[in-house]
């Protein structure tokens, strides 16, 4: 068996690379649509300021896009290096949407992004606008296929286990594509990216307004970001509610951990606003509850129960026992006893083989597992409650803070008095980290909440890892952290540098720092203006 330290280090390495990568992805998703909207306004109005907005914000987008691509490449290699059995077991299914993403969406995006930056003087207005919209389409199609793959990991549909090949095989591509978990995850994730882009533009525009510079540019950027952000944050909240319903349908252990729902209470269940989960005692101390809310969100009804952790553990224990039976039948089939009776018996409990594989963490002989090992494996099916509970509330808290921000910003922009509200501009500026807090904690909830599974109910995480040494993993982990941190420092340096320069970085002669230089030259000292003229003339 692969040691637990190897599995944990492999998980840590993948989590680190994924979280670093997802620092860049949401901003890319959001900025592409903001750029497309800004350029659409430019084409419709013909006003030069909107073209300058596209070019300036596009410069910041380009920096972010380049580093996002760089950090994303490493993740794909890890499926082969760190998760070899995972790649063998489900590679034909998981690889299909990733291959489609690379051959279609990424090529579309990467091709047209060059035309976006270098086609201003070579394309007509309409042609360049089409290019910008195609960049936005490509980035969102990339997200679609990647999240189809991830959604299948959360809720594996359209695939069956083949005992002849000992692998999962795709039997229904339509079910894979239309997986409700994948679709909800896609729209919720891209909407969160739109919010990230809107907060980014809003915060930097507020900085310019506070500094009283490039006001026309900043006002228009503020207005577009506030309107786009308002629509996006409302979408995130609605789609987040839908995501909660899907989790309640197919990932009951994740939902119970998020809500620290230890017991199965009478319907409709109350929502725990805040509290302190005590995992040892299996209770939540000092819980503040809102009646009915959890039941309505998770079940869309007033009479369906939300299953508690204790009952889920008991249910999973029964499924582990079924999995032991199926594992025994699988061994007989592999030994050559492929009678119709054996195959029929195997297929009757085929959905529970993954639960039987949970015992591999404790014993190589699944069918001979002890009662203690079965009970421990059943407990493992519940992710860490405290980390899930607090991460979810951090995500929701950041989301509602941004809702307040966009309501205020949209109202002020509609009344054209945002400059007279320094408290709002400071609120927007200091809110810049909020979308990253929300997206990072949201992904933690999504991925950590799937544990102990790599593929929900099918393949346990401890079986998915490659046979590596801890030394190899520590070395590569340290190298990746150093490299990714360097990339992050480069991104921050370039972003801050160009954000401070603002549209003056376009060198059009129309903006703040360029006008200061022109003013300085115009009022240069006499000796500079005319070397033949006396200094005190």
From Swiss-Prot:
The UniProt entry's GO biological process terms, in alphabetical order, are:
aerobic electron transport chain
Segments on the Cytoplasmic face: 1-24, 117-131, 210-221, 415-472
**Subcellular location, principal:** membrane
Reactions it catalyzes? 2 a ubiquinol + O2(in) + 4 H(+)(in) = 2 a ubiquinone + 2 H2O(in) + 4 H(+)(out)
Q: How does it sit in the membrane?
A: Multi-pass membrane protein
Which superkingdom does the taxonomy of this entry point to?
Bacteria
Q: Which residues bind heme b b595?
A: 21
Topological domain ranges for the Periplasmic compartment: 45-96, 152-189, 242-394, 493-537
Give the residues the record marks as binding heme b b558: 188, 395
InterPro entries named among the record's database cross-references: Cyt-d_ubiquinol_oxidase_su_1
What is written in the cofactor note of this entry?
Binds 1 protoheme IX center (heme b558) per subunit.
Q: Which GO terms describe its molecular function?
A: electron transfer activity; heme binding; metal ion binding; oxidoreductase activity, acting on diphenols and related substances as donors, oxygen as acceptor
Give a Gene Ontology cellular component term annotated to this protein: cytochrome complex
Q: Does the keyword Electron transport apply?
A: yes
Compartment(s) = Cell inner membrane
UniProt keyword Oxidoreductase, yes or no: yes
Q: Which cofactor does it need?
A: heme b; heme d cis-diol
Give the main EC class.
translocase
Which cysteine-cysteine pairs are annotated as disulfide bonds in the entry?
none
Which Enzyme Commission number(s) are on file for it?
Answer: 7.1.1.7
Quaternary structure, from the entry: Heterodimer of subunits I and II.
The family note in this entry says: Belongs to the cytochrome ubiquinol oxidase subunit 1 family.
- Database matches in PANTHER family: CYTOCHROME BD-I UBIQUINOL OXIDASE SUBUNIT 1, CYTOCHROME D UBIQUINOL OXIDASE
Q: What does this protein do?
A: May be involved in maintaining the low intracellular oxygen concentration required for nitrogen fixation.
Protein name, as recorded: Cytochrome bd ubiquinol oxidase subunit 1
UniProt organism field: Azotobacter vinelandii
